């Protein structure tokens, strides 16, 4: 009897220890504000969830862009754009940037350095072809929303809002942030398109809580979120983050933090994730450079869905990308994520991504080595690997398998649909497929375009990571 009681007590303590993680650092789990936010987020998850994910896979492969077409939007949106002309002029002066335009991930001097432009601008994949290599990109920033593909295709961020210019890197007031700071921008109620007046390195004192309908657009400036807390999107929707460098993120102690204009509360300790997506929907992360965070680079958990992670460059990290964190969280069955045109580069160990429950389309990414494995999962996720290049670690013959399945015997995981098509394998890398060998996308093929062969990924991912755009020049 005493043994049974002791066992129950241990179980209670273990469950209690999980609550801060499950609650995403909300110190007061009875806070009515967060309870309501969670309920609202579940509604957005149901709205964002696509009952036929294969249709979105087709959408990713199909969509054509006519770069000659003006896609500025409705008359109302054009009027808003006209009113913003003075703001754009302020941040569009060539004197605000003395840096050269970028060529891409180069092999020049210095590891991980950008090489100098030696020819005309080139855009190497469909997302970039939608907006890059156009000299007026800075005056037409919001055209970016027409370029997203994959499960995050409905994301518009701050398209319908005004432009907010961040002028200061300071982050010294968590409850009443100063106007002109990034923290002040992201807590506003209305949609905003957030840009930066000049280069800056922002050391966040506590996690940065972003509200819905925001775009953080770092094009034209060299913006680093580093050596402090990370970025959190909790129970929010419709957010674009583009062009940031996120690195050396560390744990933060928590405390009173404002997460919107009308609410602040006590947050617990943050783990040190670079970007945390918690119960959030319609999220697009594009051209992000990430490395060396204390926990994960990107975590998307607790029913987050309708996410595209594209054109990003990941280096020097252990747990790269976690999609679903709880084995018993059924909300993650609705998780749908596209991982496309990314470069998983030097010094990475595992989780590129690691998936629970959800549906993930991994397409045309470049995997240049890993220490343990590249793609992993548990709880029966569906993983479609299309047109990726996998280069196994040259001196670790026991770690040449791309895939890793956890918490299941072969008799169970053999039924999970993990399929590989048009992938390229080097250094004896191999992808262990499972599920139906005749598994095909059974859906409308009105505009079906198949993924590029994995041999093309070096070109498709050439400009992965934050771009060094110069205002007035093709980016």
From Swiss-Prot:
GO terms for molecular function: metal ion binding; pectate lyase activity. SMART domains: Amb_all (SM00656). It holds the Pfam family Pectate_lyase_4. Residues 1-24 form the signal peptide. InterPro entries: AmbAllergen, Pec_lyase, Pec_lyase_N, Pectin_lyas_fold, Pectin_lyase_fold/virulence, PEL. Glycans are attached at residues 67, 96. Its cofactor is Ca(2+). Ca(2+) binds at residues 271, 295, 299. It comes from the Eukaryota. Residues 91-117 are annotated as: Disordered. It catalyses: Eliminative cleavage of (1->4)-alpha-D-galacturonan to give oligosaccharides with 4-deoxy-alpha-D-galact-4-enuronosyl groups at their non-reducing ends. PANTHER family: PECTATE LYASE 18-RELATED (PTHR31683), PECTATE LYASE 7-RELATED (PTHR31683:SF69). Belongs to the polysaccharide lyase 1 family. This is Probable pectate lyase 7. The lineage of its organism: Eukaryota, Viridiplantae, Streptophyta, Embryophyta, Tracheophyta.
């Amino acid at each position: 009897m005493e043994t049974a009681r002791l066992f129950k007590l241990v179980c209670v303590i273990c469950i209690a220890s999980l609550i801060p993680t499950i609650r995403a650092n909300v110190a007061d789990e009875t806070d009515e504000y967060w309870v309501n936010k969670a309920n609202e987020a579940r509604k957005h998850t149901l709205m964002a969830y696509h009952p036929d994910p294969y249709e979105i896979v087709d959408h990713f492969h199909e969509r054509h862009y006519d770069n000659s077409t003006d896609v500025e939007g409705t008359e109302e949106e054009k009027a808003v754009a006209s009113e913003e002309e003075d703001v754009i002029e302020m941040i569009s002066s060539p004197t605000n940037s003395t840096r050269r335009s970028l060529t891409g991930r180069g092999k020049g001097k210095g590891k991980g350095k950008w090489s100098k432009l030696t020819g005309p601008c080139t855009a190497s994949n469909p997302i970039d072809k939608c907006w890059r290599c156009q000299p007026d990109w800075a005056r037409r920033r919001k055209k970016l929303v027409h370029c997203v593909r994959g499960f995050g295709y409905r994301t518009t961020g701050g398209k319908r809002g005004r432009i907010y210019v961040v002028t200061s890197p300071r982050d010294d007031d968590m409850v009443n942030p100063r106007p002109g700071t990034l923290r002040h921008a992201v807590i506003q109620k209305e949609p905003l398109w957030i840009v930066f007046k000049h280069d800056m390195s922002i050391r966040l004192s506590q996690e940065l809580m972003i509200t819905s309908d925001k775009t953080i657009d770092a094009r034209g400036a060299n913006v680093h979120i580093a050596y402090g807390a990370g970025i959190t999107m909790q129970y929010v929707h419709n957010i674009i983050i583009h062009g940031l460098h996120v690195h050396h993120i560390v744990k933060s102690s928590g405390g009173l933090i404002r997460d919107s204009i009308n609410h602040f509360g006590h947050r617990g300790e943050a783990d040190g994730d670079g970007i945390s997506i918690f119960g959030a929907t319609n999220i697009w992360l594009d051209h992000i450079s990430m490395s060396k965070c204390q926990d994960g680079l990107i975590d998307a958990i607790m029913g987050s869905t309708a996410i595209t992670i594209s054109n990003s460059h990941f280096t020097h990290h252990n747990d790269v990308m976690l999609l679903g964190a709880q084995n018993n969280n059924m909300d993650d069955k609705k998780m749908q994520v596209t991982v496309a045109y990314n470069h998983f580069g030097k010094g990475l160990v595992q989780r590129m991504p690691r998936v629970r429950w959800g549906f993930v389309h991994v397409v045309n990414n470049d995997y240049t080595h890993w220490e343990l494995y590249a793609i992993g999962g548990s709880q029966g996720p569906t993983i479609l690997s299309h047109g990726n290049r996998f280069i196994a670690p040259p001196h670790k013959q026991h770690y040449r398998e791309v895939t890793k399945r956890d918490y299941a015997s072969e008799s169970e995981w053999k039924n999970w649909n993990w399929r590989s098509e048009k992938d390229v394998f080097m250094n004896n890398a191999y992808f262990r497929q499972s599920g139906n060998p005749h598994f095909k996308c059974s859906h409308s093929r009105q505009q079906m375009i198949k993924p590029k062969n994995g041999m093309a990924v070096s070109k498709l991912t050439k400009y992965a990571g934050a771009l060094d755009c110069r205002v007035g020049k093709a980016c």
